[in-house]
Amino acid sequence: MSESKVYPVKAHISNGALLDKAGYEAMYRASVQDPDAFWGEQGKILDWMKPYTRVKNTSYDPGHVSIKWYEDGLLNVSANCLDRHLAQRGDKVAIIWEGDNPAEDRKLTYRELHTEVCKFANVLKAQGVHRGDVVCLYMPMVPEAAIAMLACTRIGAVHSIVFGGFSPEALAGRIIDSGSSIVITADEGLRGGRPVPLKKNVDEALTNPETKVNNVIVLKRTGGNIAWHNHRDIWWHDAVATVSADCPPEAMGAEDPLFILYTSGSTGKPKGVLHTTGGYLVYATLTFKYIFDYHEEDIYWCTADVGWVTGHSYLVYGPLANGATTIMFEGVPNYPATNRMSQVVDKHQVSILYTAPTAIRALMAKGNEAVADTSRSSLRIMGSVGEPINPEAWEWYYRTIGEERCPIVDTWWQTETGGILISPLPGVTDLKPGSATRPFFGVQPALVDNMGEPLEGATEGNLVITDSWPGQMRTVFGDHERFEQTYFSTFPGRYFTGDGARRDEDGYYWITGRVDDVLNVSGHRMGTAEIESALVSHPKIAEAAVVGVPHEIKGQGIYAYVTLIAGEEPSRELHKEVKEWVRKEIGAIATPDVIHWAEGLPKTRSGKIMRRILRKIATGETDSLGDISTLADPGVVDKLIREKSEAA
């Protein structure tokens, strides 16, 4: 095997695993040779109100991109996550909630969760929400976030969740684009001991005249002081007190929309990624089962926020469709103590842990403090998600958190893919630190050069997927042309992931990072164009260019080149003001780590900014700038290098 270190499958894992090597090979072969037969069979993992007769109807043809799975089947997501478990698992714990404060926790059984979901579904109906309407959620990490999601699916409404860390401006943009007329929020969230002003942000977002919101349902989380609008605002607890707990699930078409989730692209405006009902849930359910080698007695903890796709697929829908116990954590992994994550593992006897490299690196920086006074002996499987994990962090996670006992499923996927595409399987895959290894069933990755020519064998190139899978996004909400343009125009006939990858002699994939203008900051995607447009909207900024630089905790940091308008001078105050400005426009995750005051930017004669050169300068690789003769003013490069050394 290539690469320096290989960790073979351990006997104690393979003995009880759902799949072994031969089983995986046979299923994978079947999935690509006859997708209709394979996915027709796998679709039975769900309960259908009307069984499908058609399975795969997809086209990647230029100008005719269309993705449909199970299109004549009818089902309901909440019925698959709740109702079907009531007879056998009604008293099993569905959600364990662990508060920001370690003294606070709650458990909800499947029966209790079902009751709460039915009630809140009736609340939505009473507020005039109909099938197909978009409901915006701007919630803290509390069980009510999952209850609201499932209530939407019960009545056929479409949820659009906005991460609680986004600013009022970013929230308003998503409310406007999705056409939401109702927002569900809380008075405040809690994170790391600090309140998050959710209701205040909603109030501010709704001052935008383009928003058309009639109702705001407010959960009382902290009891903090908030402004109240009698004509519009409703307390969650008041609304659920007067409704019936009986709400039959709506029969939805497999291709009816399930949710919209906004994600950054390489052009400025965030895209509303649209997922539909049947294929998405089949894929989330199946990937959860096999990738985490799920067994009935497992206690599963995914540390992601519901505001990100990982929270949708692997905190709520995948686990609950499998009848699992899923942990929802309000806090952060190092509060109030560095060993909080390990404490939670022990407290709830977590057997499967799914977290992000950013969290792992932050804990690694604290060494053994991260595991002090904890045993973590309940852990069986560990996972990584959000960005490629560097081998050093992988090794630390494996040795220190998992004590060399637990295989690590290093999962690669995207908001657009609905579920995991490339990942080890615990009983199947020999592990290599830093590699996402092999594709899941039905996933056909390929590497191509910049001209789109396929690259064979051990090589490096642009990562594309050559055929559809059930969890794939169907379109960009309200803009199918942008969907085709973004994902299918670079390499016609193939889905372009925007990532580069390396394939080794064993056919293992190693994700090398974005090849487009998208950053991965702490596992969160940020389009450089989005940050740049926030910067240039500042009255004193004439021009800005943003690139990613390596960051030892966040993976990538944000390096902003900023040119001021004539007559303005850089200052410490302005530096602070610009950072605050971006935080207000987008949210704290978009705050630049470095602001480089630049007299000018390197441009081609046609006016295109040469980001390749800016990346090299930002990372100090000034001896390999390549050809700069095409620049309108090559002298600008020396100036930038000089400015950087002066700033340092």
UniProtKB/Swiss-Prot annotation:
Official protein name in the record: Acetyl-coenzyme A synthetase
Entry keyword Nucleotide-binding: yes
Any one cellular-component term (Gene Ontology): cytosol
Residue numbers of N6-acetyllysine PTMs: K608
Similarity-based family: Belongs to the ATP-dependent AMP-binding enzyme family.
Top-level taxonomic group: Bacteria
Record's catalysed reaction(s): acetate + ATP + CoA = acetyl-CoA + AMP + diphosphate
Cofactors that this protein relies on: Mg(2+)
Binding site for ATP: G386, E387, P388, D410, T411, W412, W413, Q414, T415, D499, R514, R525
EC number: 6.2.1.1
Enzyme class: ligase
Keywords linked to the UniProt accession: Acetylation, ATP-binding, Ligase, Magnesium, Metal-binding, Nucleotide-binding
Function comment: Catalyzes the conversion of acetate into acetyl-CoA (AcCoA), an essential intermediate at the junction of anabolic and catabolic pathways. AcsA undergoes a two-step reaction. In the first half reaction, AcsA combines acetate with ATP to form acetyl-adenylate (AcAMP) intermediate. In the second half reaction, it can then transfer the acetyl group from AcAMP to the sulfhydryl group of CoA, forming the product AcCoA.
Residues that bind Mg(2+): V536, H538, I541
Gene of this entry: acsA
GO BP, one annotated term: acetyl-CoA biosynthetic process from acetate
Signal peptide (UniProt feature, chain positions): none
